[in-house]
Amino acid sequence: YDLEANQIDVHSVSARKPLFMDESAHDWRLIRLGRRLGWTGVALKTCKTQTGALLGACWAKAHGMTLMVQDLTNPMLAQIPHVLLAAHVGTIAGVETNAMQFYPEASAPEAAVHPGENRMAKTDRPLRVILL
């Protein structure tokens, strides 16, 4: 939602459970606003610009916020900076991505060069990316 237009104080919620900013967290200034409103974490997305994700990660970490990396439809070469960001910023659970699940053939040329990035493993949990 539009965080600037709808400044809802969420401290009462985040006092009970971690609360992650998602779609409105595309700029470090909005992450700052979210933290002021009570959000405790941020879901970074390289599809909103790599620079924005990096600056957001830096600001959030410097202010004690928890990080996730989620881009649900980043296929092909866009997948590479997405997983690299998750590998280096210290997320709570690696990376969330499912472009390979929804349209696996979109990344076939990249999978030939970077096979571990696009291989899915079935577990008793939802599908996850295996990074080799």
What are these regions (language model features)?
Residues 1-73, 77-79:
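Catalytic core of soluble alpha/beta enzymes
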